[in-house]
Design a protein with these regions (language model features):
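Cysteine-centered motifs
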Residues: 10-12
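Conserved P-loop
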Residues: 21-96, 142-153, 166, 189-204
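Short basic/glycine-enriched coil/helix segment immediately N-terminal to the Walker B
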Residues: 97-105
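Structural motif
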Residues: 35, 107-109, 135
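Conserved P-loop NTPase "ATPase switch" module shared by AAA+ and STAND
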Residues: 105-116
Length: 205
């Protein structure tokens, strides 16, 4: 699994290291949305964990993960190489993002955003009404390269968009797609062993 995490990364628009560490007052007043997208094994959750580690000593953070994604731990958000941070598991974001739960929260990290049916409306409310700093990571397409949930709908309202890449499991080139290894046709089939990251050539051959 470690070889798959030899990542290619492309950060679009501008670098955010300083902003992530300080969250300037003007950002806090207006809200902020960052999207982290990519194929399987591209380091999306690792990026989210790194964001948490940069911010947790200065800000109150809520980490949310999809309840169906308990492959590595039942109460912690985990990367493929088992780096973990505390999180809340839920099927719908509205359950844990009501106003009464947000009073002391500065930053909200959402993992596997493509799975949440209420992602768009909830994130818009968090950023533009409650002025929270929200980071959402997820797949930019399913195994058929089709739109997955409503995560792509957030691009027009995002402050920043980051596209991550993996290493092709077949040839070693830059991977941009998730190829399913099993025969299920359902869009949602959770499990890292069911997929490999592949480049365009290997996806089509």
């Amino acid at each position: 699994m470690f070889r798959k995490l030899n990542l290619y990364k492309c950060i679009c628009l501008y670098k955010l290291k300083d902003k992530m560490e300080t969250l300037p007052n003007e950002i806090a007043r207006r809200g902020y949305l960052e999207l982290i997208l990519g194929c399987m094994f591209s380091g999306k959750t690792t990026y989210l964990v790194d964001t948490y580690n940069k911010l947790y000593s200065k800000f109150n953070i809520k980490v949310i993960n999809y309840s169906g994604d308990t492959r590595y731990h039942s109460t912690m958000l985990s990367t493929h190489d088992k780096v973990m941070i505390p999180c809340i598991f839920t099927n719908t974001l509205s359950d844990v993002c009501e106003e009464k739960y947000l009073n002391n929260i500065d930053v909200i990290l959402i993992n596997e955003g493509q799975f949440f049916p209420d992602l768009y409306d909830t994130v818009c409310n968090l950023v533009e009404v409650h002025k929270k700093q929200v980071y959402v990571c997820g797949l930019d397409g399913d195994f058929k390269r089709a739109k997955f949930g409503s995560i792509l709908d957030l691009i027009p309202i995002a402050d920043n968009f980051i596209k991550l890449f993996a290493k092709c499991d077949s040839c070693g080139e830059k991977a941009i797609f998730s190829k399913r290894l099993t025969n299920e046709n359902d869009q949602v089939v959770i499990g890292s062993t069911n997929y490999i990251p592949v480049c365009r050539h290997c996806y089509n051959n």
